[in-house]
Amino acid sequence: MLKPMYYEFFFIFPKERELFESFLLDTTHLALEESSLENLKAFDDKETIEFISQSSWHYFATHDPLKEHLKEKPQHLKNFVILRSQKDLNNSLILALEAFCLNLKQNLQSEFDFFYLSRNLASKDWLEAYKQAILPVQCAKFYIHPSWHQKPSHISTDDCIMIDPALAFGSGHHESTSMCLELLSDLDLKRKNALDVGCGSGILSIALKKQGVSALVACDTDSLAVEETLKNFSLNQIPLLAQDKVIYGSTQKIEGRFDIIVANLVADVVKSLYSEFVRLCNHTLILSGILETHLNSVLQIYYNGFEILEQRQRNEWVALKLLKKQPIN
């Protein structure tokens, strides 16, 4: 009997990677995995390392590519995005990305390239290999682990978050998520009310509940994210109380004010939500998912309403802990 197949896509986006990642999520509704050759080596995935390193990468550019700049293999293999699907998206997805590049060129008046590889493998083999590759990670006080890894006996259940990365939008391995968890670990949130904007897998909402918040609202504009959040609350045996809500939609549906707001988004969305965060935030705002190249434009917008308490950076990703400025009477 033939094993079912799945399709694996590797992408490198030299410019505006977060815009392309958002486009992939919106277009395919599939979770993305960001990785690097270093991470794959840690997973001992020799077959994938060999495939990525030795294959001739295809590319698309919105300008006539210069041979000295666009080689068969891109030189910047530090980061790439992996997408896996049970359907062959090769033709439709590449055409959609090409159209997106052209649209970005027109709107942003800049040139855009992307590199890609694809392959297909047996589903059963991949699922087992993937489970072996995903390891638990410690993010400050929080121990993040998939359901097929048992927590160590010396770690308290209160500090453990169970997330299955194959199904999730955020698993603690990405810099932006881990920095959010680190910033949350330092806060006393007992009897506080909290808002998680762009909840994704629900990992930050679960962390907020474990930190003792008395009321939680989580929202996301992706219905799949709402389903994942609810699923992961159940996986972690955290009941949603009467005052807790998981909402499909953005902040416009939310009333009241919150002691703490967390938003692990992309820079453009963070900038667009400034007035909403001014309306909703009563004290602390944690922002993440901001690439270093967009940091100054974010700070320029948030300067009038918030004070910077802490800034963290890991690789090219930045997270901010902000304090709401109170009006002077």
Swiss-Prot record:
Paired cysteines (S-S): none
Catalytic activity: L-lysyl-[protein] + 3 S-adenosyl-L-methionine = N(6),N(6),N(6)-trimethyl-L-lysyl-[protein] + 3 S-adenosyl-L-homocysteine + 3 H(+)
Transmembrane segments: none
Keywords of this entry: Cytoplasm, Methyltransferase, S-adenosyl-L-methionine, Transferase
Major place of residence: cytoplasm
Entry-linked InterPro entries: Ribosomal_L11_MeTrfase_PrmA, Ribosomal_PrmA_MeTrfase, SAM-dependent_MTases_sf
GO biological process: methylation
GO cellular component, one term: cytoplasm
Keyword Transferase: yes
Residues engaged in binding S-adenosyl-L-methionine: 177, 198, 220, 264
Gene Ontology molecular function terms on file: protein-lysine N-methyltransferase activity
Enzyme Commission number(s) from the entry: 2.1.1.-
Pfam families in UniProt: PrmA
Cellular compartment(s): Cytoplasm
Signal sequence extent: none
Family from the record: Belongs to the methyltransferase superfamily. PrmA family.
Function text: Methylates ribosomal protein L11.
HAMAP family tied to this protein: Methyltr_PrmA
Protein name as annotated: Ribosomal protein L11 methyltransferase
Record lineage: Bacteria, Pseudomonadati, Campylobacterota, Epsilonproteobacteria, Campylobacterales
